[in-house]
Amino acid sequence: MAQNDHETVDMLLVGAGIMSATLAVLLKELDPNLKMEVVELQESGAIESSNPWNNAGTGHAGLCELNYTPQSADGSIDIKKAVGINTMFEVSKQFWSHLVAKGTFGSPKTFINPVPHLSFVRGSEGIAYLKKRFESLTKHHAFETMVYSEDKATLAEWMPLMMPGRPADEAIAATRVEGGTDVNFGALTNQLLQHLAQQPGAQIRYNQKVTHLRRADNGWRVTVKDTRNGGDREIQARFVFLGAGGGALPLLQLSGIPEGKGFGGFPVSGQWLRCDNPEIVKQHQAKVYSQAEVGSPPMSVPHLDTRVVDGKKSLLFGPYAGFSTKFLRHGSFLDLPLSVRPGNILPMLSVARDNMDLTRYLIGQVMQSPEQRLEALRKFYPEARAEDWRLEVAGQRVQIIKKDPKKGGILQFGTELVAAHDGSIAALLGASPGASVTVSIMLGLIERCFPEQARSPEWSAKLKEIFPAREKELESDAELYRSVSSRCSEVLELTAKNDVQAPVNAE
């Protein structure tokens, strides 16, 4: 390739999942003149973690996920994380409603549907915790619509599939928020990509593998291989975003930026039990989360979810965790060993030493029999029959391993944005709550990598138009929260009666 034989873009985004799609469309909203390209290794968008069947949980808003509200040593409930995730999800809703209102999408029902969110516990300790959680959360305006019950008749209305077959004296309780949602991030991603592809100066190319990243005078020189015809090309980009899910870590290492030194990855795979039997599916219209078993990691929180994909309802139960050395579902078994570097070997060994309980848990999950999986399901749905459910492999998650001055290395659950000091390249690492808070994460990236533009009158005005209220305002101003949330729910058709709604009585 000749010295000058390269393409030039303002923005190069690696990975055609929800993160890159959101960032690209958001940047185009802020500056329509930007020239950008999205490159994706697979043959289409949203193949990996953004795919609805690979996504461990959707519509995360802190309403039902008990691991977001830990109990402190003094017995109090810490609601900070739940409030933070709730307001971030509201920011996502603002972006989606902005795009719906301007006609970017068709019906919002193609990607978001109303599904109540419930927390469900068994036993006196679980009930005491849930009641205290309810009392703590409902003091905040973001959770004021939450209701609590221990009444079996009420619970049968909320969870008609889950109540028959339980012992009459079983101590159970639940909270319910009617305004929860289910989000098909695969459909949302592909609609964002379709919209982006129609914009001047934007293109999306599939079957593209990034093989080299190196600094250039004005940004980065990136070598991309076409996996179908084998040809290489070079792209000169002022800014590069590595939004390739589990594949972001190897690309970050390839960049060589000092900010990426010391990071490692711990891959965790997932499996689900899936039910498509309409007679069963119609009896459950909810996402019901419970507590993880004592000593189990956060990704093990069991839940029984209504999923709406392409207009059809299914039920998913799990997740059952597993272990694979792949960083992507369509990745290589060499991903983990090839990610070991002199700079991250100590953190990775430290995590291996300090997380033997997690290792044992994952081995136990891998060794589970079908009967053991069914037994876990029956804690939610006592009358479950094996023939109505099938086991499906879900997507890969790569949890973050990072340096720690005391322990050498720690395993971090969540997401982390890693950016070069000059803002010319950024990578998103980690997993949950992931997709549900994509918009907030990408806004954070814009403020970090494009600080001057973000403060400019043009970008500031556009951001205020798209986002009438950001996270801190939503957290502190109850009236603003109510008005913005209500308007977004109306635009996204979350307040009207949904055609996928199931009956709630127990008969």
Curated annotation (Swiss-Prot):
Classification via Gene3D superfamilies: D-Amino Acid Oxidase, subunit A, domain 2 (3.30.9.10), FAD/NAD(P)-binding domain (3.50.50.60)
Involved pathway(s): Carbohydrate metabolism; tricarboxylic acid cycle; oxaloacetate from (S)-malate (quinone route): step 1/1
InterPro entries: FAD/NAD-bd_sf, MQO
SUPFAM superfamilies in the cross-refs: FAD/NAD(P)-binding domain
Domain of life where this protein originates: Bacteria
Keyword terms: FAD, Flavoprotein, Oxidoreductase, Tricarboxylic acid cycle
GO molecular function, one term: L-malate dehydrogenase (quinone) activity
Signal peptide: none
GO biological process: tricarboxylic acid cycle
Keyword Oxidoreductase among UniProt keywords: yes
Disulfide bonds: none
Cofactor field: FAD
EC number annotated for this UniProt entry: 1.1.5.4
Family: Belongs to the MQO family.
Protein name: Probable malate:quinone oxidoreductase 2
Gene symbol of the encoding locus: mqo2
